[in-house]
């Protein structure tokens, strides 16, 4: 059975207060002066003090083979802050640190280890505050107002490096080859790792490591590094440094899912909801010039306009990509929302998903069998549900303690206001009719004979995304739905968590003393007219799921308060994020893909045209990470997702999967 949690570090603290691994019988850092050793070996060995001021790009990427207590990262972060203070006009503005850790410390052990270095306390406190739960895969932490990005990959580095997407090739400016000593942890120090380091290293990229072991030096040389010995720190005689001087040929392992970015830094986003708002922020942070075209007279008038939306992950025992994406998207969303400098109504009160019939009970039992971290999801027995949620349901279920609700409309409006302060230009009542290539740019034609020309375009306009010739064949569909707004009652006011059943019910929003209950589901419909049938069905589903609950029968929908919207969805419940694929060219180029995989060309796409769509009913959970993924792809920066899960987000995936099996593909 696939496990979705990571084992924490098994450690103790010695007499000097230094953490020691029980499994590897080795210290995490030197008893003498671990901080100075880090500065000497990794910062000095990679000549960062000299390279930072001369770096010709706005981003410097460093990768590390063992995160441990984070000493290397914290020391580097402090040094980077000092560099930026001394060189405010330097080209280099942001730091990206990628690290792998098989056995992450608990937050408590991390804080205890950090007490060793009071001079690093301001940086350590930020790291501890965002320390992720023990889930496999990549956890992106945005630190220091997003000037510093930390990608923590939890799992075995020799397994993870084979799961990295090709887009990470030749991105790393410097390697910190760290970890327990080769004699203590020989399984990590492999030729497989050395080869992966070479594949990821940028031409001219460097490496440094504390060891001078001969097999390490020879292995790195075989991988392509030019190696040399340097005086070791303190009592250690020697250490190793290296440079990637040659450019290695790097064939794409899965060209049909290849992602391409853009050399340009000017973009038009078509939208007006949560997707376009969060993407605007992510691109502005990377130095893009961003314009947003919204068809409505104000933002969040479409699917992002609800008063309350639930935040919790979508999990399934039988879909690894779904689990990997939504579990990491959920934890990223919580970190992102918690540090977002805008106000919006929300309450991280928890979400409880109830087994109201045999089918839903079986589904929950399967989720609970996946060895999920307790921080993510825990079982709740029927007799405990009332205590946790505040209302009696006579059902058992699964609770997401870090979930809750937020106001999507308010979030979208205020994020866009923040983005405007950072340079975003917004044009309201601009309905895009069509777009076409003109002189290496995109010509946008709007209703009313308005036109605009932009270097890059992102379509983030929800269910309207397939209305253009370039996107008309996308396998997405519309879902119309109605959310009912109901006044609270004395019993409903006791509801402390979001309830999910064959619908959902939120606790009251203190701002208006109303709850949200929903939502109806009409696949293929774009009708946004109020429906009395939907209003009654929202109430009836609640009563049907909890027939013994008197509070459910007291729900009042008679005032006809509701909101209707239309979502964009896919049959595999995953978003579509990336290049807009060229349908006709895909069918031509991949006509014989099943028999000729080795000869496959890169995925046919429209140049400088991207999409961010099909968020379905989980946009609040998926949008923050999707925005980060797309902004990173467009900017040719490291993407926080493994290759197979990233492929599951590719807009061409449903076509390519059929073509790989030699099956016919139909549009739409």
Swiss-Prot record:
Cofactor(s) listed: FAD
Catalysed reaction, written as an equation: 5-aminomethyl-2-thiouridine(34) in tRNA + S-adenosyl-L-methionine = 5-methylaminomethyl-2-thiouridine(34) in tRNA + S-adenosyl-L-homocysteine + H(+)
Pfam families in the record: DAO (PF01266), Methyltransf_30 (PF05430)
Disulfide bonds: none
Organism phylogeny: Bacteria, Pseudomonadati, Pseudomonadota, Gammaproteobacteria, Enterobacterales
Keyword tRNA processing listed: yes
Protein's recorded name: tRNA 5-methylaminomethyl-2-thiouridine biosynthesis bifunctional protein MnmC
Chain residue ranges for the region called tRNA (mnm(5)s(2)U34)-methyltransferase: 1-245
Location relative to the cell: Cytoplasm
Record field: transmembrane: none
Keyword tRNA processing: yes
Keywords carried by this UniProt record: Cytoplasm, FAD, Flavoprotein, Methyltransferase, Multifunctional enzyme, Oxidoreductase, S-adenosyl-L-methionine, Transferase, tRNA processing
E.C. designation(s): 2.1.1.61, 1.5.-.-
Region (FAD-dependent cmnm(5)s(2)U34 oxidoreductase): 270-668
Cellular component terms per the entry's GO annotation: cytoplasm
GO MF term list: flavin adenine dinucleotide binding; oxidoreductase activity, acting on the CH-NH group of donors; tRNA (5-methylaminomethyl-2-thiouridylate)(34)-methyltransferase activity
């Amino acid at each position: 059975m696939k496990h979705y949690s990571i084992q924490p570090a098994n450690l103790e603290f010695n007499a000097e207060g230094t953490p020691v691994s029980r499994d590897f019988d080795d210290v995490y850092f030197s008893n003498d002066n671990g901080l100075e050793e880090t500065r000497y070996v990794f910062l000095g060995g990679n000549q960062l003090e000299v390279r930072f001021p001369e770096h010709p790009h706005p981003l410097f990427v460093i990768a590390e083979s063992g995160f441990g207590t984070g000493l290397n990262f914290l020391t580097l972060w402090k040094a980077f802050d000092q560099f930026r203070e001394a060189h405010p006009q330097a080209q280099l503005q942001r730091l990206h640190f990628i690290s792998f850790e098989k056995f992450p410390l608990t937050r408590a052990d991390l804080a205890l280890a950090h007490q060793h270095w009071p001079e690093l306390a301001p940086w350590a406190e930020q790291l501890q505050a965002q320390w992720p739960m023990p889930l496999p895969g990549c956890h992106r932490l945005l630190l220091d107002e997003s000037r510093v990005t930390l990608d923590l990959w939890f799992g075995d580095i020799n397994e993870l490096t084979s799961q990295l997407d090709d887009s990470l090739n030749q991105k790393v400016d410097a390697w910190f080859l760290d970890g327990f000593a080769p004699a203590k942890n020989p399984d990590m120090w492999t030729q497989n790792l050395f080869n992966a380091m070479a594949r990821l290293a940028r031409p001219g990229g460097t490496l440094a490591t504390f060891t001078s072991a001969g097999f390490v030096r020879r292995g790195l040389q075989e991988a392509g590094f030019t190696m040399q010995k340097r005086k070791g720190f303190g009592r250690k005689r020697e250490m190793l440094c290296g440079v990637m001087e040659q450019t290695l040929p790097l064939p794409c392992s899965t060209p049909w899912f290849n992602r391409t970015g853009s050399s340009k830094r000017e973009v038009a986003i078509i939208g007006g909801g949560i997707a376009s708002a969060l993407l605007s922020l992510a691109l502005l942070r990377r130095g893009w010039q961003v314009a947003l075209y919204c068809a409505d007279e104000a933002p969040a008038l479409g699917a992002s306009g609800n008063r309350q939306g639930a935040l919790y992950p979508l999990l399934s025992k039988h879909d690894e990509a779904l689990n990997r994406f939504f579990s990491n998207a959920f934890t990223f969303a919580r970190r992102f929302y918690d540090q977002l400098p805008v106000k919006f109504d929300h309450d991280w009160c928890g979400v409880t998903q109830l087994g109201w019939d045999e089918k839903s009970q079986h589904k929950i039992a399967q989720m609970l069998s996946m060895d999920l971290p307790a921080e993510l999801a825990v079982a709740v027995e029927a007799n405990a549900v009332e205590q946790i949620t505040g209302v009696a349901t006579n059902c058992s279920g699964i609770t997401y303690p870090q979930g809750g609700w937020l106001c999507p409309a308010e979030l979208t409006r205020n994020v866009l206001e923040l983005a405007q302060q950072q340079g975003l230009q917004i044009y309201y009542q601009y309905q895009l009719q069509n777009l076409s290539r003109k002189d290496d740019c995109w010509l946008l034609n709007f209703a009313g004979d308005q036109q605009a020309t932009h270097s890059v375009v992102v379509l983030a306009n929800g269910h309207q995304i397939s209305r253009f010739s370039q996107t008309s064949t996308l396998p997405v569909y519309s879902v119309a739905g109605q959310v009912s707004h109901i006044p609270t009652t004395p019993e409903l006011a006791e509801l402390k968590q979001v309830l999910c059943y064959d619908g959902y019910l939120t606790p009251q929003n203190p701002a208006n003393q109303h709850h949200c209950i929903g939502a109806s589901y009409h696949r293929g419909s774009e009708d946004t007219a109020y429906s009395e049938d939907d209003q009654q069905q929202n109430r009836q589903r609640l009563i049907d799921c909890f027939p013994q609950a008197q509070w459910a029968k007291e729900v009042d929908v008679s005032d006809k308060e509701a909101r209707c919207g239309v979502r964009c969805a896919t049959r595999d419940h995953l978003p579509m994020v990336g290049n807009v694929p060229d349908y006709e060219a895909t069918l031509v180029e991949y006509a014989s893909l099943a028999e000729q995989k080795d000869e496959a060309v890169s995925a046919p796409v429209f140049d400088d045209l991207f999409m961010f769509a099909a968020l379905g009913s989980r946009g609040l959970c998926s949008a923050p990470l999707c925005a980060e993924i797309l902004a990173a792809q467009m900017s040719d920066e490291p993407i926080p997702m493994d290759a197979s899960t990233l492929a599951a987000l590719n807009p061409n995936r449903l076509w390519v999967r059929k073509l790989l099996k030699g099956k016919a593909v139909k549009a739409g």
